[in-house]
């Protein structure tokens, strides 16, 4: 990502005229969410800063989907408010994922590097299983938390020069980079000869489930199995296996190794399945764009109706995906609950809705709760029921 950052230092964004997976120039726009501020630019009243074009383009060569522009990464990631350890769901998943990797690799004392390690929660899980833990993260506030935990962490954007590792994990970060080819080339250089990289990308079923709200400026790419295979080969790696895990709306875990490694049947099977679902046709994506517009219009009508009847409408989870929905149609909720203390007391970008802690739900009046962070729906429902026991929701 270093070169991409240098390219954008003198301007706030770069137009993406080529597919970042295959390099082709045949891009077709299918989703327009207008101009929006950065989804994580929560503020204290001073404003959310500039707005940028938001939408999705389809590469008709490899069926990769991506944003039309790349915002300067330093504006989004130097100080980051998304903290992995805030969610019990994520903490449990990190434990599962560490065990999953350990069982596959048959290693208990190997070296593992987590790219975009956040507050070190995933590294915590690996260390409990005996791994030597290394990390890289560009956010100084989060890097310091991981460092205090005792992990060997560097404050930087990937790729950087790094000793070779037995395993490299990258959860929800490869899709955030304006140059994923450079990202994977850095992974290749830092893998031992028999090393394995686990590249996780979220919302593997976003198009089948109309999950357009996962579109925001941090998420530059939305990989399919086919586009990840194409990108890996360009980087000199091979996609050897694919798993789908029940986190973030179901996520792909792409398993990459050096060339010559055996390829599991899951790769061809997943690509074939995507094709039968329509993901290798242009009309599939055009319909997705139309459905997205219909959803935001219906949500605004519902919120407006409830508020007109005197019922407060409260969002739960000041997640980036929620900001996309609200800003797409200027939807004004009464307030938003979030369990991340770093966000409490701030206002949402664009819509300027106050963010409060969950105790704000403890009122006698009937309320409607909109689970903006719907990928944690069960956890949200449990929290709401606990606070509002016996009250109408």
Please provide the spans of the model-predicted regions:
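A conserved beta-strand element that flanks and buttresses the S-adenosyl-L-methionine
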Residues: 169
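Conserved acidic E/D residue at the C-terminus of a beta-strand in Rossmann-like folds
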Residues: 137, 338-340
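Phosphate-bearing ligand-interacting subdomains
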Residues: 160-163, 174-178, 351-393
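Short, glycine-/aromatic-enriched active-site segment of Class I SAM-dependent methyltransferases
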Residues: 197-221, 225-227
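N-terminal juxtadomain amphipathic helix
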Residues: 3-89, 243
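Extended interfacial segments that mediate partner engagement and assembly in macromolecular machines
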Residues: 49-145, 150, 155, 211-212, ...
